[in-house]
Amino acid sequence: MRTLHVDLGERSYPIYIGENLLGDARWFAPHIVGRRVAVISNETVAPLYLETLLKALQGHEVTPVVLPDGEAYKQWETLQLIFDALLKERHDRKTTLIALGGGVIGDMAGFAAACYQRGVNFIQVPTTLLSQVDSSVGGKTGINHPLGKNMIGAFYQPQAVVIDTASLKTLPSRELSAGLAEVIKYGFICDEPFITWLEEHMDALLALEPTVVTEAIERSCAAKARVVGADERESGVRATLNLGHTFGHAIETQQGYGVWLHGEAVGAGTVMALEMSHRLGWLSAAERDRGIRLLRRAGLPVVPPAEMTAEDFMEHMAVDKKVLDGRLRLVLLQGLGNAVVTGDFPREILDATLRTDYRALADQLGDE
């Protein structure tokens, strides 16, 4: 078992990473302030892991709240179901919420914790690779709006993040690939040697080789913890964690939440960010192609939806959270391992990026 720390002063918390942590009270008891706990999960994860988690919560009064599964349910009506359950069972301010599931559950449970009686404790127990390496760490919580992804929410830090790598054994291959989009992101934005490591270990990652998976999670969480510790509320460097996300969120919104998995949209969006960085002269063609090949090896789509026009992208990107004073800012790369956030680019470069034939670009790279 490995422990990392997110250093935020009085809001600091540990990240526990290991196998078979879910049923062990040692990782939960120090972070539960009262006797009452509400476990927020979904219809897919609860049958697999709720019973095991309950073993770690013996001695506490537990309210399970099982929600429908999927990005399409990350909205007000589903959030209301959490509040309904908490109020019906008369949970008070000493209640601890535990998010047992992927990114959707973690985001909604965290937002519910931020809002319920103006703030109660919560613990993240992420069960997908994407949530383990990204969304469970850093305190971003919230829900989607029909006009934009994650536009309603709060920064609210958990008491702890408990990552049980055994939960990945039941993860569908499509979800595993989606999570790898966020793992690869860390190499692209701040850790070029990690890119080489991922190239060397991608087959082992896809095969869920335990020591390799644990190292990938630890390196990803360590990178996320460093960035969050330096910029909790995304006023500066934390925005670099959104590489590929502005393009990706546009894909998710246009296609309908849940049609493309978040990581899939980020994968295609990252290809677009690589292409734009190349067009600006910041990435060589070889660097761009290296990035695309790695994303493709991870099983990710490297071509955005063919039916999406440049105008479709611009419509959705106009409501991105990184827009300031009406100016779109993007996360781009000035070399692999060096991300920048900038709104200082020629409009025609963005337009050309949105109109690029990504199918032809992918075909040009050939098969692995």
From Swiss-Prot:
Coiled coil: none annotated. NAD(+) binds at residues 69-74, 103-107, 127-128, 140, 149. Its EC number is 4.2.3.4. It is found in: Cytoplasm. Pathway: Metabolic intermediate biosynthesis; chorismate biosynthesis; chorismate from D-erythrose 4-phosphate and phosphoenolpyruvate: step 2/7. Zn(2+) binds at E182, H245, H262. Pfam families: DHQ_synthase (PF01761), DHQS_C (PF24621). It comes from the Bacteria. Its cofactor is Co(2+); Zn(2+); NAD(+). Its main location: cytoplasm. It is an enzyme of class 4 (lyase). Keywords: Amino-acid biosynthesis, Aromatic amino acid biosynthesis, Cobalt, Cytoplasm, Lyase, Metal-binding, NAD, Nucleotide-binding, Zinc. GO terms for cellular component: cytoplasm. One of its GO terms (molecular function) is 3-dehydroquinate synthase activity. One of its GO terms (biological process) is amino acid biosynthetic process. Binds 1 divalent metal cation per subunit. Can use either Co(2+) or Zn(2+). It catalyses: 7-phospho-2-dehydro-3-deoxy-D-arabino-heptonate = 3-dehydroquinate + phosphate. Belongs to the sugar phosphate cyclases superfamily. Dehydroquinate synthase family. Catalyzes the conversion of 3-deoxy-D-arabino-heptulosonate 7-phosphate (DAHP) to dehydroquinate (DHQ). This is 3-dehydroquinate synthase. It comes from Pseudomonas aeruginosa (strain UCBPP-PA14).
